[in-house]
Amino acid sequence: IKGEPDASSFPSGGLRATFEARGYTAWDPTSYAFIKDKTLCIPTAFCSYGGEALDKKTPLLRSMEALNKQALRILRLFGNTDVKCVRTSVGPEQEYFLVDKDMYEKRKDLMFTGRTLFGAKPPKGQELDDHYFGVIPPRVAAYMADLNEELWKLGILAKTEHNEVAPAQHELAPIYTTTNIATDHNQLTMELMKKVARRHGLVCLLHEKPFAGVNGSGKHNNWSLSTDTGVNLLEPGDTPHENAQFLVFLCAV
């Protein structure tokens, strides 16, 4: 399945000749299609007339193939001929802040930039563990439950949610999956986090540092290499031979 949309504005407008301005979309069959707002959405790669990548999915798929090729070469040196494919996997932990919508609308800096640009320090920050190890507030718990259901509808395996270190900070962790699928899922997750928050009178902030003086929001990737036979190449082995293989891949990474 291939499309031919206009690509004259990619990577930026006016840099490419008119006869080379068309682009090509190609379906990424390894990433699941999904229905959003009565529209069938098909994950695609986007390339130029000359084959240059115009998106971020194409370089990712190429890097995954390069890793697969070189990892198989190393496995063959260790005498492993059973493995046919090596895949990278990611389980991105998405951290975020939740702010009351009424309070949010009183701060123009939050509305325009997604973070605070000025203001006094709060009387209490994250010095104590009353938030991190505290009970999830009912309003936030209702948001998390609603978000989980919306994510499951799209096949996104949201698994864990909990409070984070900073006040009003929380985290969502899905079950890990193949890198390109996990990347697509994370984009959908961030979109839905903002959308669902509005239903509960909240605003979801995904900026990496929305408030000074407290922790920002990270996104731990939990990246690894796995074979099609179910072996995690970044897991230490039980024998010296298996440890040698593990150390080679660890040093390569």
Model-derived regions, located:
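Glycine-rich, acidic/polar active-site loops that bind/position phosphate-bearing ligands
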Residues: 1-206, 211-253
